[in-house]
């Protein structure tokens, strides 16, 4: 495997993103990187990929260049490897939010919700409760089509089609969360962090976010208490608990996830259609990925 894939995000107040955008894009292009970087007043969200020397140089740049005034000096990155470049081009975009919730009162850059690390969460799930004896509820904050690729055992899944639906479904299902320890989770941490802050703000108690999301959990403890793989918003489509790309692909036409067995169907035509959207099939078309949900569009 020769390509290094980096993912990172941070909620932090940023005032100079218009000035940063062309400079960051130029540095990434000089290094030969591809991917997506989102900049918003509330922070940064990125997925980039390239050779080791290029990704190392980018990490040094974002952490230490005076341009960023130390805001990313300790920015943590999640790393995985792939045989090829998963992105087609390099994009640096300005957004209102780095992950869209459409709740302007939420200010995650002003303080985080409590977080639980992977090893502590595994211990809670092993014993069936947290350290205070409360039952632990895993709350999936991702879109329904992502959940279908894999999720934690017995996780709550409200079948949302986009993250901006999250506040409404939580309000409608508060009874599911009362008296329990809630651990929100997502792919890399960004959605579950914002989700946990929202739940705290509306008065739900004992809420945690999974530090680093599913990918960090895989890195630290593997696939314990998790079934399936983890959808990612790039051309790898899904990663297994060893953080290796799976045989799943994304349908060119409808963006549905097509697992290996479905690729054997005569209704699957690479570059044209899959069993979910084949014109001769009466099935339901696959759900599309929400633009901006993760930094390949983006984390």
Curated annotation (Swiss-Prot):
The active site is at residue 186. Its EC number is 1.14.-.-. This is tRNA uridine(34) hydroxylase. InterPro entries: Rhodanese-like_dom, Rhodanese-like_dom_sf, TrhO, TRHO_N. CDD domains: RHOD_YceA. Catalyzes oxygen-dependent 5-hydroxyuridine (ho5U) modification at position 34 in tRNAs. It catalyses: uridine(34) in tRNA + AH2 + O2 = 5-hydroxyuridine(34) in tRNA + A + H2O. Residues 132-226 form the Rhodanese domain. It comes from the Bacteria. SUPFAM superfamilies: Rhodanese/Cell cycle control phosphatase (SSF52821). Pfam families: Rhodanese, UPF0176_N. Signal peptide: none annotated. GO terms for biological process: tRNA modification. Belongs to the TrhO family. One of its GO terms (molecular function) is oxidoreductase activity, acting on paired donors, with incorporation or reduction of molecular oxygen. Keywords: Oxidoreductase, tRNA processing. HAMAP family: TrhO.
